[in-house]
Curated annotation (Swiss-Prot):
<dbReference type="InterPro" id="IPR011768">
    <property type="entry name" value="Transl_elongation_fac_P"/>
</dbReference>
<dbReference type="GO" id="GO:0005737">
    <property type="term" value="C:cytoplasm"/>
</dbReference>
<dbReference type="InterPro" id="IPR008991">
    <property type="entry name" value="Translation_prot_SH3-like_sf"/>
</dbReference>
<protein>
    <recommendedName>
        <fullName>Elongation factor P</fullName>
    </recommendedName>
</protein>
<comment type="similarity">
    <text>Belongs to the elongation factor P family.</text>
</comment>
<keyword id="KW-0963">Cytoplasm</keyword>
<keyword id="KW-0251">Elongation factor</keyword>
<dbReference type="Pfam" id="PF09285">
    <property type="entry name" value="Elong-fact-P_C"/>
</dbReference>
<dbReference type="GO" id="GO:0043043">
    <property type="term" value="P:peptide biosynthetic process"/>
</dbReference>
<dbReference type="InterPro" id="IPR013852">
    <property type="entry name" value="Transl_elong_P/YeiP_CS"/>
</dbReference>
<dbReference type="InterPro" id="IPR014722">
    <property type="entry name" value="Rib_uL2_dom2"/>
</dbReference>
<dbReference type="InterPro" id="IPR015365">
    <property type="entry name" value="Elong-fact-P_C"/>
</dbReference>
<keyword id="KW-0648">Protein biosynthesis</keyword>
<dbReference type="InterPro" id="IPR013185">
    <property type="entry name" value="Transl_elong_KOW-like"/>
</dbReference>
<dbReference type="Pfam" id="PF08207">
    <property type="entry name" value="EFP_N"/>
</dbReference>
<comment type="pathway">
    <text>Protein biosynthesis; polypeptide chain elongation.</text>
</comment>
<dbReference type="GO" id="GO:0003746">
    <property type="term" value="F:translation elongation factor activity"/>
</dbReference>
Length: 187
């Protein structure tokens, strides 16, 4: 059990039998009335985000989430196979569980897998990943109608928007949370 004063981003709560992760929270002390905590909760299974308000001091049940260091091995149909770094056990995780970050998974990439009661909840990739551009068109210097970016296909098959000066074969640093371009990796 956790008190509302123990809330922090990333804490997983058990509300109405559902696992909810705190994405954002704010303690509010109005001029009149009791204090409360306003939160944004993400359903760990479905990914749906909801707003929920708790009265200050309320006890809420927390879920024990075990984060394990794992290595991504390979893609098998609609599943992704990972190996536990300590026990060397292999587990398959569905594409639905991994979500949109699956497009940035590269073989032998170190990731963290959150587990609850032996079942994988979600996969956390490093915030920035280094991937090579396999295809992009030549960007014309005078072409500014697109805001100075062009599409590029990465070695994982993901397509991202990159600046015009990026060429095929360049190694890029990409934000795995939203797919945005962070910079070029110096070779």
């Amino acid at each position: 059990m956790a008190d509302t004063s123990d809330f922090k981003n990333g804490l997983v709560l058990k509300i109405d039998g559902q696992l909810q992760q705190i994405v954002e929270f704010q303690h509010v002390k109005p001029g009149k009335g009791p204090a409360f905590v306003r939160t944004k909760l993400k359903n760990v299974v479905s990914g749906k985000i909801v707003d929920k308000t708790f009265n200050a001091g309320v006890k809420v049940e927390t879920a024990t989430v075990d984060r394990r260091d794992m290595t991504y091995l390979y893609h098998d149909g609609s599943d992704y196979v990972f190996m536990d770094g300590e026990t060397f056990d292999q587990i398959s995780i569905s594409e639905a569980t991994i979500g949109s970050s699956a497009r940035f998974l590269l073989e032998n990439m170190a990731v963290q897998v959150a587990m609850h009661e032996g079942a994988p909840l979600y996969v956390e990739l490093p915030v920035s990943v280094e991937l090579e551009v396999t295809h992009t068109d030549i960007g014309l210097q005078g072409d500014r109608s697109t805001g100075g970016t062009k599409p590029a296909t990465l070695e994982t098959g993901a397509e991202v928007q990159v600046p015009l000066f990026i060429n095929t074969g360049d190694k890029l640093r990409i934000d795995s949370r939203d797919g945005s371009y962070l910079g070029r990796v110096n070779a």
